[in-house]
A protein has these predicted regions:
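A short pocket-lining beta-strand/turn micro-motif at the edge of beta-sheets
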Residues: 29, 60-63, 71, 92-94, ...
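Bateman (tandem CBS) regulatory domains
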Residues: 1-7, 61-72
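Short hydrophobic beta-strand segments in globular cytosolic domains
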Residues: 40-41, 99, 104-105
C-alpha cells in the first residue's frame, strides 16, 4: 500500500466537489466509493473526472455514484507485489484497489511498486 495512503474514499452521495477535494488531499489520482461500512462500491479516477467534464454535464448535480467505475480491478491484502504488478500491466492501469472480502483496505499505485524496486 502507498506509504502516503490515507485511504481516499467518498460515499456515493458525495458531491463532485467533495470527490475532487478528497482526491486532491490524498494525492493518489483515485478515490474509492464505499458504503458506510467501507464496502467497495466503485472507484473514481482523474481520468473519470476528465471524461465527465468532456461530456458537458451539469457538474453541480453530479454525485460520486454518477461517475464511479463499478467493479474496479482489485487485489487481496495477502497477494504478492508481483501479482499486483501483473494486474496493473494486464489492465493498463496505474492504481489497484486492495480489498478484503469486499471491504476497502487501500490503494496500490504503480509508483509504490517503483519506489520499492519491483519495477
Amino acid at each position: 500500500l502507498s506509504a502516503s495512503n490515507e485511504k481516499p474514499k467518498v460515499l456515493p452521495s458525495h458531491s463532485l466537489k467533495q470527490v475532487i477535494v478528497e482526491m486532491t488531499q490524498k494525492r493518489l489520482g483515485v478515490t474509492a466509493v464505499v458504503d458506510e461500512q467501507d464496502h467497495l462500491l466503485g472507484i473514481i479516477t482523474d481520468g473519470d473526472l476528465r471524461r465527465m467534464l468532456k461530456d458537458n454535464v451539469q457538474i453541480d448535480k453530479v454525485k460520486a455514484a454518477d461517475i464511479m467505475t463499478v467493479k474496479p480491478k482489485t487485489i487481496g491484502p495477502d497477494e504478492l507485489a508481483a501479482e499486483a504488478l501483473n494486474v496493473l500491466r494486464q489492465n493498463e492501469i496505474t492504481q489497484l484497489v486492495v480489498t478484503d472480502n469486499g471491504l476497502y483496505i487501500g490503494v496500490i499505485h504503480l509508483h509504490d511498486l517503483l519506489k520499492e524496486g519491483f519495477i
